[in-house]
Amino acid sequence: MIERIWSGRSRLYWLLLPLSWLYGFITFLIRQSYRLGWRKSWRAPVPVVVVGNLTAGGNGKTPVVIWLVEHLQRRGYRVGVVSRGYGGKAERYPLLLDDTVTTAQAGDEPVLIFQRTGAPVAVAPRRRDAVSALLAQHTLDVVITDDGLQHYALERDIELVVIDGMRRFGNGWWLPAGPMRERESRLTSVDAVIVNGGTPRTNEIGMTLTAGMAVNLLSGESRPLSQLHDVVAMAGIGHPPRFFATLREAGVSIAREIAFADHQSYQPEQLESLTQDATQPLLMTEKDAVKCKTFAQRNWWYLPVDAMLAEPRATQLLDKLESVIKRHTSNRT
């Protein structure tokens, strides 16, 4: 129902408009309070890059964070990542990730980023605390914050917005009548707009998600997707239909598609009941897999995806980030 409302296919959004006006007014006041100096932002001693979005729901933000980390690492830079840690609850914050930290503590996306990149990752409700914790333990050249475009308490040097190229901004209304956290006009003040799927517009950076081979959660074995048949596909992400579409485009034979809520926590018996028997493959997202590895079965697989940003804008973006890092380094010396 909410997808129909947000996409503009249902006129029920009229009932939610008063709440949306209130949401928009509050967010406007918050942003203005920082712009006018009524509230103070904290400046980190290293450059901060925010990767965020204007809408609720999955847009492909985490793959972009991973892409940035990996490409900056290849250029020789020491990169850290901070996050709010949605879906996790730690005994104390800030929480620095290591191999013993679980998704129940840190959330699924920070654990995924940590496992994929090996970069230092910290989570905290206040991103300032997470950045400070990282810098107390690691010498870093740049910090990337996963989400946090609207977290104005942390000053940023670069703002990147990721958009779902198929859904874009839905009906254009603020939450809850629509998907918007901020109005589309906010894009005029960011450094780059990355469009996941669809057709990018002028000055937008096109992006696609490229699927790898299926990986077995238990053994780590990799197989081409074409070798998995009669698959039960499951996804607990912001926009599950994107995952299912990726599988269909790859020619996967899907018996069932099961969508869970974003940041869903799973129980072993819950997932074991999804397949007919122990031979039918259960194929999930990598974000789901980080929550299921401790109780995985032999027939459970996940599909890693990588963000691919279109050239030449991808290289231009990295060059811009590098110039910011170098400028900060020269100012410190």
Swiss-Prot record:
GO terms for cellular component: plasma membrane. GO terms for biological process: lipid A biosynthetic process; lipopolysaccharide core region biosynthetic process. It is an enzyme of class 2 (transferase). Its EC number is 2.7.1.130. Pathway: Glycolipid biosynthesis; lipid IV(A) biosynthesis; lipid IV(A) from (3R)-3-hydroxytetradecanoyl-[acyl-carrier-protein] and UDP-N-acetyl-alpha-D-glucosamine: step 6/6. One of its GO terms (molecular function) is ATP binding. Keywords: ATP-binding, Kinase, Lipid A biosynthesis, Lipid biosynthesis, Lipid metabolism, Nucleotide-binding, Transferase. Belongs to the LpxK family. HAMAP family: LpxK (MF_00409). Transfers the gamma-phosphate of ATP to the 4'-position of a tetraacyldisaccharide 1-phosphate intermediate (termed DS-1-P) to form tetraacyldisaccharide 1,4'-bis-phosphate (lipid IVA). This is Tetraacyldisaccharide 4'-kinase. It comes from Pectobacterium carotovorum subsp. carotovorum (strain PC1). The gene is lpxK.
